[in-house]
From Swiss-Prot:
Binding site for Mg(2+): 8, 60
MF terms in GO: holo-[acyl-carrier-protein] synthase activity; magnesium ion binding
Gene Ontology terms: biological process: fatty acid biosynthetic process; lysine biosynthetic process via aminoadipic acid
Primary localization: cytoplasm
Name this protein carries in UniProt: Holo-[acyl-carrier-protein] synthase
Function, as annotated: Transfers the 4'-phosphopantetheine moiety from coenzyme A to a Ser of acyl-carrier-protein.
Taxonomic lineage from the root: Bacteria, Pseudomonadati, Pseudomonadota, Alphaproteobacteria, Rickettsiales
Gene3D superfamilies, A to Z: 4'-phosphopantetheinyl transferase domain
GO CC term (a single one): cytosol
Primary gene name: acpS
PANTHER family named among the record's database cross-references: L-AMINOADIPATE-SEMIALDEHYDE DEHYDROGENASE-PHOSPHOPANTETHEINYL TRANSFERASE (PTHR12215:SF10), PHOSPHOPANTETHEINE TRANSFERASE (PTHR12215)
Annotated organism of origin: Ehrlichia ruminantium (strain Gardel)
Subcellular location: Cytoplasm
Length: 123
């Protein structure tokens, strides 16, 4: 049973500008250690910015699907987006008692990144 659907679009240069302005402080506030470490596979700032923009969009889409937004119960850095060995994007949330499965799709083109997520319960 579907319990929520979320979508978010991020302007990649916005993420790059925030990263340049606030550096590691921005990264640590928004992204998990795993996401930051995973960005090291990209050699260019643009590649890293695309990586971070897709993950930013995924976090926003996730809380939209939940219908809660961010707050005391869930922070951006509590959410980790990663890819399986076959490249499928996955999402996990630490400190969460929510038992939903997530189907996540990420994409980017030119200056935009997008995330689409469906949360569902196992029947």
């Amino acid at each position: 049973m579907i319990v929520g659907i979320g979508i978010d679009v991020v302007y990649i240069p916005r993420i790059l500008n925030l990263w340049k302005k606030f550096g590691n402080k921005f990264l640590k506030k928004v992204f998990s250690q795993e996401e930051i470490k995973d960005s090291n596979k990209y050699t260019s700032c643009e590649g890293k910015a695309r990586h971070f923009a897709k993950r930013f969009a995924a976090k926003e889409a996730y809380v939209k699907a939940l219908g809660t937004g961010f707050g005391k119960s869930i922070k951006m850095s509590d959410i980790t987006t990663y890819n399986t060995l076959h490249g499928k994007p996955q999402i996990t949330v630490k400190k969460s008692n929510i038992d939903y499965k997530a189907e996540l799709s990420l994409s980017d083109d030119t200056d935009y990144a997008i995330a689409f997520i469906i949360l569902h319960k196992e029947s």
